[in-house]
């Protein structure tokens, strides 16, 4: 494997997992804070808010998993290496 392609793949994998975890991490913190604020304002709606929060957190976490998959493909099954 070309050393330039190998080093670029490692750098791209690091960027993929770093950026893929940054956005959802910030969004999950924001969503959790807003959900807690909503529960504090309307305690009777706690069940609906919690269910919606857990579903949205799962969708946000899937973005991080996609970034992990891209990073693993770049590291171990690199399509650019011949």
Swiss-Prot record:
Question: Which is a Pfam family this sequence falls into?
Answer: ATP-synt_C
Molecular function GO terms recorded? lipid binding; proton-transporting ATP synthase activity, rotational mechanism
Coarse class of the primary localization is membrane
Q: Which domain of life is it from?
A: Bacteria
Hey, where's the site called Reversibly protonated during proton transport on this chain?
Answer: 61
Where in the cell is the protein located?
Cellular thylakoid membrane
PROSITE patterns assigned? ATPASE_C (PS00605)
Per the record, membrane topology reads: Multi-pass membrane protein
Q: Where are the transmembrane segments?
A: 3-23, 57-77
Q: Which UniProt keywords apply?
A: ATP synthesis, CF(0), Hydrogen ion transport, Ion transport, Lipid-binding, Membrane, Thylakoid, Transmembrane, Transmembrane helix, Transport
Q: How is its activity regulated?
A: Inhibited by dicyclohexylcarbodiimide.
* Gene Ontology annotations for the cellular component aspect, listed alphabetically: plasma membrane-derived thylakoid membrane; proton-transporting ATP synthase complex; proton-transporting two-sector ATPase complex, proton-transporting domain
Its job: F(1)F(0) ATP synthase produces ATP from ADP in the presence of a proton or sodium gradient. F-type ATPases consist of two structural domains, F(1) containing the extramembraneous catalytic core and F(0) containing the membrane proton channel, linked together by a central stalk and a peripheral stalk. During catalysis, ATP synthesis in the catalytic domain of F(1) is coupled via a rotary mechanism of the central stalk subunits to proton translocation.
Query: What's the family?
Result: Belongs to the ATPase C chain family.
Quaternary structure (record): F-type ATPases have 2 components, F(1) - the catalytic core - and F(0) - the membrane proton channel. F(1) has five subunits: alpha(3), beta(3), gamma(1), delta(1), epsilon(1). F(0) has four main subunits: a(1), b(1), b'(1) and c(10-14). The alpha and beta chains form an alternating ring which encloses part of the gamma chain. F(1) is attached to F(0) by a central stalk formed by the gamma and epsilon chains, while a peripheral stalk is formed by the delta, b and b' chains.
Q: What is this protein called?
A: ATP synthase subunit c
Q: What is the originating organism of this protein?
A: Thermosynechococcus vestitus (strain NIES-2133 / IAM M-273 / BP-1)
Lineage of producing organism? Bacteria, Bacillati, Cyanobacteriota, Cyanophyceae, Acaryochloridales
């Amino acid at each position: 494997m070309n050393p330039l392609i190998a080093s670029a793949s490692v750098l791209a994998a690091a960027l993929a997992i770093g950026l893929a975890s940054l956005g959802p991490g910030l969004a999950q913190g924001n969503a959790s804070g807003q959900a807690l604020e909503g529960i504090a304002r309307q305690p009777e709606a706690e069940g609906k808010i919690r269910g919606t929060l857990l579903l949205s957190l799962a969708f946000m976490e899937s973005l991080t998993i996609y970034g992990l998959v891209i990073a693993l493909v770049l590291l171990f099954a690199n399509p650019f290496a011949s």
